[in-house]
Amino acid sequence: MKRKWEERVKKVEELASYYERNPLPTVYKPRLSKPLQPSRVWKIFCRQADAFRFVKTCKEDVHVFALERNTQNGQRFYLVTTYQELWYYYTKGYKTSLMHCYEVIPEKDACKLYFDLEFYKAANPGADGKDMVAKLIELVSQKLKELYDVNCSARDVLNLDSSTDEKFSRHLIFLPCKTVFKDNIHVGNFVRTILQPAIRLVGSNVAAPIAEGGAGYTSQCSAPTVELDGPLTNLTAVEDASKGWPAIADQRKETETSHHGENSEFSFLIVNNKEGDKQLFVDLGVYTRNRNFRMYKSSKAGKNVILTIAEDNKFVPNCEENVSLEEAYFLSSLVCNVRFEDGTKILSSNFVEEEIKMSAFLRSKTTRSTREPMEGYQESPYPEIDCFVRSLINKDGVQGGIRQWNYFSGEEILVYDISGYRWCENIGRAHRSNNIMILVDLKKEVWYQKCHDPVCREKNFKSQSLPLPSRICLSSLFIEEEDHMVTDERENTEVTSHSNPADLSESSAYLAINTSQDTQWDNASDDAYLVETAEDVELAEAADYSLGYDTEEIPDEVLLEMSWKQDTCSKDDS
């Protein structure tokens, strides 16, 4: 008996000595089924800012994805994982939020050139979507060659389709060899630059039938900034600020006249929306900070139509070792999945020459330095305020709409250009031909009305300032509960980095952050936490410099710069 006991003690001592020399890892990180696949990282957050902070702490090549719940409020959660792990579970067919998955395009990250295209079929009975896509690819390829000396064809463009009986819808991902853009803001600048003739057609409010013949595209925009593995070289000249406003206005008229013939070649890009108003075939609202872009094989929440390979797609990816064709398509479709190799071109783009010249003139006329405003044609960075503005212009039997928004980050003012609703406080009635603007001051939490009408503008008229509803003021939007717990019908559910994605079908619908595991974030000051919240809500950071003048509003000259892109009428009301 004693001998057996001594043998056991000896074995235990030998094991203890072995594990002292070869200790177990402190954290066990299981891998996927294939040896070459990375260690698993799978963590879900309720807030986008928290997800990006977690990414910075990871050694693995992880990315942020948005998961949309199948609810009417469009609530989203944010998943941090690798491309390989996401694809591994993406194709398992689990009934989870992976069915409605979006790639989050981080600000300032290099990315591919991409497009979101759509039109309603009933409102555009003569539109040939496939032909329009082919013409757009031809146009963009020509501009890439003209401005950057980049060769591209339809065989370098991944064409994804999610069309329905009601709507034609495509995503295009351009994949020219060893070519990426500096970030998606520069992508947006490039797209707006090459589509200026079409944008002017929309602004002119002139019916433009869809062209059936080929389009002869001629460059009319300034050469953008190009970065080729080195510092940026600005190739765009800025006009002398000493020139006067009338001269620039006359020059604009001459330019519009000279390009009238060219504009007609871009008419294939003009479509009707549901209300019959003109809009672009290309959605210009998808080039914003931290944009959520729907992924290949995903559908919108509440919808069953997924993004699939289009019938007229000509792109075929190169399959690397241990990568299937389907996975290769998936990896090619990811906007931020870019590689930096020797000879990679990093493209950048400024605004069109016309806008840069006008900005230079305005800076000479105002004693301040203003950032270029953000702009868009659909949702602004503040959807709650968008809804409030729509409530102001949809009343008394009049159906108004938001034609365009502009965000002045330095002043924190949103300018909404209104269509279909022309009531003006200055004259006490609706203008006959000139549209109005609704301005929202986010700092003062008030709104007021101004006009495109020359008489009102000459008087520098603005209506009385009225307070915003408390529910949409930023001070209330930034207030969040300390615990972001979403309660299951039965009990609270935690999702940590060790949760099994296969169980997401039961837990992802009611997710919660395990705040005890993220104490490093909890220890941050309230002010820092509030700043991170603001960054998650806003699409543009507030200017970090002080203004050199005292004023309560944006000068009309600055508003005029933006209104030139829109439908303005110079006739006085009688």
Curated annotation (Swiss-Prot):
Reactions performed catalytically: ssDNA + n NTP = ssDNA/pppN(pN)n-1 hybrid + (n-1) diphosphate; DNA(n) + a 2'-deoxyribonucleoside 5'-triphosphate = DNA(n+1) + diphosphate
Positions that bind substrate: 76, 116-118, 167-171, 291-294, 300
Record's keyword terms, sorted: Chromosome, Coiled coil, DNA damage, DNA repair, DNA-directed DNA polymerase, DNA-directed RNA polymerase, Manganese, Metal-binding, Mitochondrion, Nucleotidyltransferase, Nucleus, Transcription, Transferase, Zinc
Coiled-coil intervals: 2-22
Binding site for Mn(2+): 116, 118
Biological process annotations from GO: error-prone translesion synthesis; mitochondrial DNA repair; mitochondrial DNA replication; R-loop processing; replication fork processing; response to UV; translesion synthesis
Function in brief: DNA primase and DNA polymerase required to tolerate replication-stalling lesions by bypassing them. Required to facilitate mitochondrial and nuclear replication fork progression by initiating de novo DNA synthesis using dNTPs and acting as an error-prone DNA polymerase able to bypass certain DNA lesions. Shows a high capacity to tolerate DNA damage lesions such as 8oxoG and abasic sites in DNA.
Family listed: Belongs to the eukaryotic-type primase small subunit family.
Designated name of the protein: DNA-directed primase/polymerase protein
The encoding gene: PRIMPOL
